[in-house]
Amino acid sequence: MIDSQLPLTDIHRHLDGNIRAQTILDLGREFNLTLPATTLAALRPHVQVIEAEPDLVSFLNKLDWGVKVLGSLDACRRVALENVEDAARAGIHYAELRFSPGYMAMTHGLPVAGVVEAVIDGIRAGCAAHNIDVRLIGIMSRTFGEDACLRELDGLLAHRDGITALDLAGDELGFPGRRFLSHFNRARDAGLRITVHAGEAAGAESIWQAIRELGAERIGHGVKAVEDPALMDFLAQEGIGIESCLTSNIQTSTVATLADHPLKTFLNHGILATINTDDPAVQGIEIEHEYHVAAPAAGLSVQQMRVAQENGLKIAFLSEEEKAAVRARLAA
């Protein structure tokens, strides 16, 4: 359950994995694109997971239609604004929305830096209209290789003031983190915070690599950490947070059942683990579902859910003053 006395956060939430089906239809018509369906009901199986996908890459393919319709920078601005609206409607007080500007730019050849600027504009407009604090995490999509990731990093750093952190996402097995060392060195030099998708498709060594070589302060998913007791101890001792996404890990077949999910083990071990959505529109869920349905099915007690909710703000990429402001806004 969600504790109404605590700020509700979602710090692992993909902006480009949360494009409304209606928006996909609208933009498809606007740019005269051929979509796989012309009604919401018929489109949904193409853009939303109906049954668990066999692997992570199959799951990621569901995101493609959402970005294929981004035919202009205004379209990018629209989906960013709608993401803030969706988070506010879900009762979230603080969100970190992450996006891959190269992925969003790819289909229609948009300028990557322009996509970054449009997303920042949309987020700022959304925050001005709703009682929510949102920060942006730029993603480098490892699946497209080192050069494409460099272009993404260039675009993100061109608008550094609007970007809080850097992430690496995509095909973890095919494109291991060691290929992106120079990218992360540059990002850290620019003052960006670091989170990395690791231990989702690959094993515990991928998490070690993200921490030791890329400078990860948090780990996205990280389910394979349970395979390495020394890593579990290290995560707890060093305060390296885990951004858990329960339903997502079932839908990608990363974990067989919610009862098998390691989130409870993480919390019992003193790791700063959190509850997040991942790709709400693609998954057909919202943060409330993760607390009210997924977390109990994963064996979490009410107290453990409360701890996970507290951890969300604890490991957020905010200063202590900014965290206090989030708490004060809830109390007001």
From Swiss-Prot:
Annotated residues for binding of Zn(2+): 12, 14, 197, 278
Gene name, Swiss-Prot/TrEMBL: add
General function of this protein: Catalyzes the hydrolytic deamination of adenosine and 2-deoxyadenosine.
Active site: 200 (proton donor)
EC number from the UniProt entry: 3.5.4.4
Naturally occurring in which organism (per UniProt): Erwinia tasmaniensis (strain DSM 17950 / CFBP 7177 / CIP 109463 / NCPPB 4357 / Et1/99)
GO cellular component, one term: cytosol
Keyword presence, Zinc: yes
Catalysed reactions listed for this entry: adenosine + H2O + H(+) = inosine + NH4(+); 2'-deoxyadenosine + H2O + H(+) = 2'-deoxyinosine + NH4(+)
Binding-site list for substrate: 14, 16, 170, 279
Superkingdom per UniProt: Bacteria
Alphabetical keyword list: Hydrolase, Metal-binding, Nucleotide metabolism, Zinc
Family classification: Belongs to the metallo-dependent hydrolases superfamily. Adenosine and AMP deaminases family. Adenosine deaminase subfamily.
Cofactor needs: Zn(2+)
GO process annotations (BP): adenosine catabolic process; hypoxanthine salvage; inosine biosynthetic process; nucleotide metabolic process; purine ribonucleoside monophosphate biosynthetic process
Site (Important for catalytic activity): 221
Pfam families recorded: A_deaminase
Protein name: Adenosine deaminase
Cofactor stoichiometry and binding remark: Binds 1 zinc ion per subunit.
Catalytic class of the enzyme: hydrolase
Molecular function per GO: 2'-deoxyadenosine deaminase activity; adenosine deaminase activity; zinc ion binding
